[in-house]
């Protein structure tokens, strides 16, 4: 298997975005966001389809570079009928719930990017990529983070964010939404005005707030990220409080 560093993946992501920008429908535009469906279909020649991938909703995307059947589930939860979907090596299968009204579009877009990146790495490294996965031929994306114990999946997850949120797009979108060249604090309680701008920016870019905040931090465009815990700014740990007393 090919071992790629974060810098290697940034280089690959840059090459993919450069090729995307040369597509006739994109060429000449100042890129502010990536249409991940268009990139997937027009640049990579992949097809996106939808099905119910698991009974508990944990599995949200899958793909394969070969012909193989995968189990899918009926829309009616009471049905016991076995169903299979035949992947053709060029199809990305996304959980159908991600297309429902009110679903997290950022999660859906990231899943498309994630599954696309399996194909990108296979195209770039056909003799190295996928050969260490104990014969695995189907790649799955899960709703919850299962950790980075799988090096192959870490590379795909990292590249997926880089392609969905390339540096030039993030910088231009920050300018568009009045966040300047660097966001000092992301905190919905103590910096609500900037938080609303950030929220609008994430929606505009088709990304989840979590993915965008992590990407901005990686790029040095966000100094402090309190997205998951806005009160961490003022919280005093019990041990520290005991020392004071």
Task: List PLM regions with ranges.
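Active-site hotspot residues in diverse enzymes, especially metal/ion-binding acidic/histidine motifs
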Residues: 1-245
């Amino acid at each position: 298997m090919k071992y790629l560093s974060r810098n290697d993946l940034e280089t690959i992501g840059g090459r993919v975005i450069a090729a995307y920008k040369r597509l006739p429908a994109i060429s000449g535009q100042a890129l502010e966001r990536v249409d991940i469906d268009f990139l997937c279909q027009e640049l990579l020649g992949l097809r996106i389809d939808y099905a119910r991938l698991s009974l508990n909703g944990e599995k949200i995307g899958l793909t394969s570079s070969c012909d193989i059947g995968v189990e899918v589930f009926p829309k009616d939860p009471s049905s016991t009928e076995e169903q299979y979907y035949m992947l053709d090596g060029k199809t990305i299968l996304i959980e159908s719930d991600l297309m429902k009204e009110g679903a997290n579009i950022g999660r859906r877009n990231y899943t498309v990017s994630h599954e696309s990146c399996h194909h990108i790495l296979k195209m770039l490294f056909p003799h190295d990529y996928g050969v260490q996965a104990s014969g695995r031929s189907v790649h799955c994306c899960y709703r919850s983070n299962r950790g980075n114990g799988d090096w192959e999946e870490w590379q795909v997850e990292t590249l997926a964010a880089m392609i969905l949120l390339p540096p030039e797009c993030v910088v231009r979108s920050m300018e568009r939404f009045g966040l300047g060249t660097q966001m000092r604090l992301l905190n919905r309680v103590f910096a609500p005005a900037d938080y609303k701008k950030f929220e609008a920016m994430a929606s505009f870019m088709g990304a989840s707030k979590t993915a965008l905040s992590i990407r901005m931090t990686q790029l040095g465009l966000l100094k402090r990220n309190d997205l998951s815990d806005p009160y961490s700014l003022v919280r005093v740990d019990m041990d520290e409080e005991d020392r004071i007393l």
